[in-house]
A protein has these predicted regions:
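Short beta-strand/loop motif that positions the catalytic acidic residue
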Residues: 210, 216-218
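Gly/Ala-rich beta-loop-alpha elbow adjacent to hydrolase catalytic centers
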Residues: 93, 97, 101
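Conserved alpha/beta-hydrolase "acid-adjacent" motif
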Residues: 223-228
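Conserved acidic catalytic loop of the alpha/beta-hydrolase fold
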Residues: 71-89
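Catalytic histidine-centered segment of alpha/beta-hydrolase-like enzymes
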Residues: 247-260
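Conserved alpha/beta-hydrolase catalytic His-Asp/Glu region
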Residues: 127-131, 143-206
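Conserved HGGG/HGGXW glycine-rich cap/lid loop of the alpha/beta-hydrolase fold
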Residues: 9-62
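Flexible "cap/lid" loop of the alpha/beta hydrolase fold
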Residues: 106, 112-145
Length: 281
């Protein structure tokens, strides 16, 4: 474990293995340790780097929501990779982590060798829809402020976006619940306000500038989220898109064996994607 200080904030970073670097970025309410089930296989072919985003795990939780912004954390991660001598790196991100990864690819293209986005969003361009999302995230943040982590997790786990997780084995669901409960309410509240989809600068018009070979992974049970993933893959020139059948918003949790195969294959691909794979069908 390493503490790396960037722009006044301290991040918890872990690395291991041997080979080309791969940065794995967790989702909201998660932490770098979420990727632990996949690390043994990855470390046979790569040097893995996991990080706790701000407000999560053992990284700092700045009180100012603006410090949690996707744009600032993407810049932080670019700096961390450079400090580690791990740039350019393959970058994998899930949900919030996918948004950070996508911003990293847009703003610091030389840092990202390859890009894997699981259940991504490029932000919300429509002002009305964006305002609606900001209001929804503020409601969740107020639950954290007023009622604490237990009430928030109860609400969070019953959101429609996570309905497909109910099919996971009870043991896995129990571990996931326990991990969510270990979060700090102030950190999650600041993250919601500063790094939520509504707070993020929309990237739609800039996706065509992403030159890194990209794999976009989603679950068809994610509904609108799956549609977003398809649209993002279509907008990135060197992208291919894959749906993991029977999964929703979190394919890496709902189908870990299939997702692990995708991850290892992603790391093994060092050449640009063939033309036939560049667009979703």
């Amino acid at each position: 474990m390493t503490r790396i200080h960037v722009d006044g904030a301290s991040y918890e970073v872990r690395s291991g293995g041997d080979g080309p670097p791969i940065l794995l970025i967790h989702g909201f309410t998660g932490r770098g340790a979420d990727w632990a089930p996949f690390l043994p296989a990855l470390r046979r072919v790569a040097t893995t780097i996991t990080v706790d985003l701000l407000g999560h795990g053992r990284s700092d939780s700045p009180a100012d929501p603006a410090r949690h912004a996707v744009e600032r954390q993407a810049a932080d991660l670019a700096a961390i990779l450079r400090q580690l001598g791990a740039s350019p790196a393959a970058v994998v991100g899930y949900s919030l982590g996918a948004r950070v990864a996508l911003r990293l690819a847009v703003a610091s293209s030389g840092v990202v060798a390859r890009l894997m986005l699981e259940s991504p969003s490029a932000g919300i361009a429509d002002p009305a829809a964006r305002a609606t999302r900001v209001a929804a995230d503020e409601e969740l943040a107020r639950i954290l402020d007023r009622a604490g982590i237990e009430a928030f997790v109860e609400r969070w786990e019953n959101l429609p976006v996570f309905a497909s997780e109910r099919a996971m084995p009870d043991l896995d669901r129990g571990r996931l619940h326990a991990a969510r409960m270990r979060n700090r309410a102030p950190g999650l509240a600041a993250s919601l306000r500063g790094a939520g989809q509504g707070a993020m600068e929309p990237l739609g018009s800039r996706l065509a500038g992403v030159r890194s070979p990209t794999l976009v992974v989603a679950g068809p049970l994610d509904g609108v989220g799956a549609d977003r993933a398809i649209a993002i893959a279509a907008a990135i020139p060197a992208a291919r898109q894959m749906m993991l059948e029977g999964t929703g918003h979190a394919p890496h949790r709902e189908a870990p064996d299939r997702f692990a195969d995708l991850l290892v294959d992603f790391v093994a691909r060092s050449a640009p994607l063939p033309t036939s794979e560049r667009k979703p069908t």
